[in-house]
Amino acid sequence: MIKVLGLLLGPLSSWVEVSGPIIIFGLYYGFLATLPFGPSKIYSTRSFLLGKPGYGIIAISGSITGQLIGFLSMYYSPIYAALWKPYAITLLVVPYMFFRFFQIMDKPSSSESPHLMNSINNPKALSLFMDGLILQLLNPILLANPVLTRLVNLFLFRYSPNISFMISGLCGWLGGHILLTIFIKWVSFRIDRNSLIDNTLLRRYINRTFSLLILCYCSFYLGRAPLPFLKGKNYEDNNGRSVTMARDDRSVAMARKNRSVAIDPQKLQELIKEEKFFRQQPWPIMCFDHNRVYQPIRYIGNSPFTRLGPVRTEVSQYFFGAYSSDGKKRISFTFLPSVLVLGEKLVGGYRDFLYTSCSSEDPYYRWNHTVKRKRDSLGNEFSDRVKALSHGSPAENVIERRVKFSNSNGDSFTEMYDPFLNGAFRGTINQFESPQMLNDSIISNLSDFIEIFMRDPKEGFPNDPLGYGYHISYLWQELEHESFPLPWEPLPTYTVRSLVPVTISSNPGTPQPKYALNRLKMKKISYLIQTPEIQPPYWLWIAWRSSIIHVPVQVARCYGDIYTNFLVYVYGRFDRLIKPSASGIIRMDAISCLFKKEYLFVYENLCFLFECLAQYEWTILLISRAGIPRDKRYSMEKKDFISLYREILLNEPLQIREIRKHVPRWSSGLMIGEYDDVDPVLLSSNRILSRKVKDTMTFDIGQRRIGVVQNRYSAEADYRRNLIQGSIRAKRRKIMIWKRIQPNVHSLFFLKRKEIPAYPKDYYDTSDSGRVDKEQIGEEVREKIQRVEDPLSQQTIAESLCLTWPELHYFRGLLLMAQSNIRKNIILPSLIIAKNMGRILLFQVPEFYKDWEEMRREMHVICASDGTELSETTFPDKWETQGMQIKLLFPFRLKPWHRSKPQSAKRLRWSYLTTFGLETDIPFGDPTSNLGIFSKFLKPIFKKVKRRLMGSTGIRRVPRVGYIDKSELNDRIQNKLLSETTPMGSANDSSEVNDQFGYETQTINVKDQDDWTTTMKERIESIAIINSSPITGMSLVDSEIHTGSKGSFNILGSTLKKRLVQIRRIPGLFRNKSVQLIRKRFYSIKFFIKRMDRRMDRDLLPSFINFIASNIKFWIQSAWIRSTRNITTIYGRIFIINKDISRINRGKITNYYSINEKIQDFEIRPDRNMFSMSQAYIFHKIWQIRALDIQRILDHEKPQDLKENDWKQWLRCFDRYNLSPQIWSRINPNKCRNIVNKQCTCYEERFVPYEQQEDSIFATVMEPFLGLLRKMNKRYRYDLLSYSYLNSTKDLDILNLTDIPGPPVQPAIPDERDITDREGILKEKFINDIIEEDWKGTDFNIVNGSRSTVDIYDAIRSCDYDHTTSIDRQKKKTDLITNQQGIDETRRENVGIMDSPKIEKRISQLDLNFWLFPELSGIKNIYYETKSKFIPGNSLLREERERKKIEEEERKETTNVLEQIIGIRSNVKNKQVEDGQDKNGQVEDQDGQDQDGQVEDQQTDGKKKTNKGLFQCKVVDVLGKKRFFYLANICRVMSGMKDPGTYLRIQERNIDLSLMAFCIAIQKNSSANKISKELALQRNVRGKVRNDNEIREDKKIMVFQPYRLSSIVDDQFLMYKIVSISLKLKKRAGEWIDGDFYDGSVQRGKILGDEKNIFSSLNLEDILLPKRRREFRILNRFDLENDHVGFSNGKDIQNDEELMGRDQHLSVDTTQIIKRFLWPSYRLEDIICMNRYWFNTNDGSRSAMLRIRMYPLTVN
């Protein structure tokens, strides 16, 4: 039995252990579900109290049933969809609740049976049950803030698959209801037992109380939504523009009394009709009207530059919805999202409610039918046009013409206003979004400009029901409004579109923009008003409006073309009579004569209009008025002005009114708040609930006292957030402001979690113990949390009462002033005297002067309550009730002595004075200990005493660092030794050097320092085993180096092992001595043990270890240096004996010499038969042996038998750095190494990781420069792609030189066409082959024809000159011929490598690294191909001796070579350079004659055809001589680097920023200043050098461009070239169809109007317009229900038999027919869709380039 129980209890216990938390979790949340006390709970409690417990049980049973249905809805979706649809339950239940409400309000009768109802069929019991059920279902909707309900539902949905959670939750929920029932029964029993009132009267009171409670609770569900009560609308005009100036009640009453306005009967009928048909409006408008009064939420300002007042916005105007149009989804303005959701639900479930049809008609049927009809119509029209063309009609009559709008006089609209044009063809109108833009409405325009109520109250206007402004419309009718547009209609684009009124400045001659209006005092200027017709406030407004018009500078900069000139005085420019007064107010007597009825239209409205007009219109206006005498000007005002207005506006082109969406009903110029610098009479019109301003400040400027608003908001919760009075309150949570300065506010629910500060880990000082006291931290954290959790403690409440007590601020201010005077006059002088008297008693020099000077610096500034500084004497306004502060600037600090030099320590430069005379850092803050007079007095004294004690006792200062145990210290020692003792360690190595040398380092991981010797021995033995393989040149070098250094490694390993043992014994010996000392003198030195131990670990040991490490490093370097003797002997023996392997390792030996040619490491000494090599190179070779896997080289049995044709074996045998430059440049030209110079030498202090170079010049200056270069390369790629895309239509069968796009090359020497090579060392065929190989992938073409006008051999020879090995220039004629034969041999041997498909594939790719300097990209491969070919046949040692002889000559010729590369010669030459040039000229003259002879011999042998290339030059900038040489060096060095940034990082200390700017100028000017000249060295037939001034008059940089970027001038030119192809039928007859403006005329096809021959290559779709053509093709591609009706395929039209039969030139131009098929005009039009030309962007970052289908779909 026990075993059975054990078997049963085991799984049960495990299940309980796993499911226990879930069960407890479910019970908790189930019980939590009963806590929301909603209407159902209230109704159940009412039932318990009104009747017997049976009523309450029935009601609570209904509530439980409703909640059970909610639980079941999580598992059964139809129940959830039925219950929780938006407003579905509400629409069904609200009528039921409406009738139940009257039943609840009935008084309970005393005759009701107190007995329990036994049947559920009882109507009373059924109503109770249904009420509880419905109220429970409505609970989530009716509850105002259902946090608990949402929380429970969230967890129920989350854990609904867990049956344990659901069962436990249901149990907890039932338990909660049971407890609730028991509690309510107990309360009901206590009320019945202890009540002293009659039972009937008690039930009546309970019924009335709970009925009101339920009613109020049901009304709370509305939240902050507007109440559904009707309110009166604001008195505003119908067009939505309210009068800006508000009137008080008295003025409004008088205006109504005096107004006699006849109501327009027509408008009255419209209003009645609108009210009559309100109920017949469609569904959304019937319930949701965006023009209702209380719809707007808050204000939004007009612009960021002005504060003219906000603009009311409507929520419903900023929502969009989708609808079907042309089979696609379009967006349009729509209603709120909730309205859309409700409409969809109503349409889906209640179609009868919306009177919608329930037919099963397909919604797309009508659209399909429309599309079919349009397609058939287009097909029929196209067919008729083709038939007319085939019957012989002229093409000009058949081709469709574009329709233009025109008026009755025949004047057509301009392209800007043509509605048929769109996109880039239609002009753009710059419009500044301002509330005062010119509108289409007369009344709205009037309110924008004048915004006043101006009329004659006695006469009135008969047709003005609005009460103002109709006189403009009346006068407009007199001016024949049908002939010309109104002033408020759209103006031309060059007209200023907005006016920003600002007030005048103090100086009337210089208008200045301001952002607020000065407050105008009615009492001061009331005597100026003498006109009884218009009320004084309106005159003031007129004066302000007519004072000045100004545009802020920020606005003018946004639209430079429009706002070129600021607006000045309106009347000052329009009429010179009116001048503002000095006070800035225009006198009314100066302008009263202008504001008569007949001139009101002219001066009040058109002055603003003509102020916006263009310059020439103003010129006409001023000229016309300048000749009129001043006395006759007023009599002629109306007639001349109207005629001038007619003359100007009638000449403007016709325009179409732009569609605008106005903000309805609301005005745009209302006041913001109480302090807006406006007249106090207008304050009653404030319609925005702004935050309460606490106080203001006043300043005395001169003799005037000006009040300025200082926004100080109270620290209490304020919900007045710029809301419109009477509008919807935003649905937001309540917030609590409990801090003095609280930038972020949170809900009360998340307040505690958000505001608890998180202290950092290093907040506590752990320098002494190295450990943190957890108890201390816990105590401090608990204290902080307690402060946060209890913000309303007794102390906080007391402080709050003190701060809010008005009388307290008065007494506090008096105390502050008293403390300030006591501090300045008593305390500080007393302390200064006492301190200096003490110094005198101590026989020290007194410091009275310095102390008095510091005390005078202290300033006491009176501040407002929030700390805003005012002045030293002026008190803030309302300081008696709102408080004040006294701020101490440069507070005085008493010091024991002053330093001779001022200390630049960071200290607090200000503080606030408290009522006790102390200092604090914040207003109303507590005094702090680190602020005060004595804060700087005791600290220096203690510091000096401490230093004296430490000096006398021998104790030194202990660094404040963390404690380090022994294990960590040993690890640091080992890591330090590893990094210092590793030969050529990684700390001195750089990845950049590894990349340049072509190898990767291999890291040796040594776990223990004792294993270092063993590891090195294993490596040496493995290398020795490898060297036992067949000996080659490289393996012999490696083996000899290892043999020579083997002994040094052994000695080094043993020495290191001994030193490590000694180092490890040092801590143990020291601690043993310490223990012995502690045993003898324990009590005397207990205080110093811990400090001495730390000092030993931190100071003594590291210094000793550094000393040992430095010695070890020196010993290691000495060992490496001693081993170099054997290495030099080895190299000398190898190079002399091994002559047979020179051919195999030719690439390596050549590379070896190319390296040392620049750095000059090798030198031949005459007294010794050996080499002398640099130490850096030896270290490099030794370290290379460690990093080299030589076994892979010797895998092949006989590597010396490999030929260059066996390139696969070469690639398999050799590492990357072993390949010859010739082979590697063909395999991967991007990563080949061009040259290695002295800058590759590793120095310890120079090789710092790039990430650590924070303060370097490269990180701050060069990085933006490289980014610009990358963008330029990216731009080049896009240009190249676009040009390749365009040139795909070029004729491939025409290979004439004139077909190469580009500007025509004009030679600098027209008479000298045949220019030969300078030296004649290369055969022309060989050079042409090189050019063809190197220039693949570019736009350069090698043509077979006569000689080109520009010879490229000079550039090839001059560029190759600096990179080839040195050759004796005096023996060129003999040596070079021999070398040429060797080159031809090498050329034949390299055929197998060069012609392989993989190599050809790599050659065809573009070398993107050379885009930085395009002039070098065309010659880099030539350099690699020819460098190893110009090696003499003698030994290498002989070449070295010869190289030293000609070294001096090479330096002299460097200047000429650099000028040949770039194309410039300098006129400034010294004597040495001139001598060198004369000598070179003679040699070149002789070489030129030899070249002529060679050319003649070649021509006699039959080689008369020469392949020449075409170079193109451009002038980019003028450069000095010195900077030019530096630029040439940069070009040469950076051309061979993988990353140009490597050179910039190496030369960051010597970088020339102006030179880098010049490089940027080269790239920026790549599309400008293009000229074509011959190369720099142009010579005549006689071979003489021409004069520099004749060839090059200006010292300009001429850059060679092998990539033909010059054909693309800019983006707009390329776009014009693309579009010009599609516009081929310009005149439709008698002209060429397509003419390429750049490539020359190529016949595409021709339509002759007289003849009747038509080329079949013409695309017949060109008959239609492009827009209709695209529409026709799109409609044909639609598969409308598989119904190919009409012209669904265009092939039938193309195969018109009659038309094709009349074509007599069908097979004339087959190529053109194919091209017309592949590139029809509608395909070329798609090119415009490329984003970088359509959107006018220069890079591809905005959006991806569209993929264009290059071939049309083929229809089978």
From Swiss-Prot:
GO biological process: protein transport
Compositional bias per record (Basic and acidic residues), positions renumbered to this chain: 1471-1482
Bias (Acidic residues) ranges: 1484-1499
Bilayer-spanning residue ranges: 18-38, 54-74, 79-99, 128-148, 163-183, 210-230
Keyword field: Chloroplast, Membrane, Plastid, Plastid inner membrane, Protein transport, Transmembrane, Transmembrane helix, Transport
Subunit structure: Part of the Tic complex.
Similarity-based family: Belongs to the TIC214 family.
Name this protein carries in UniProt: Protein TIC 214
Organism: Pinus thunbergii (Japanese black pine)
Designated gene of the protein: TIC214
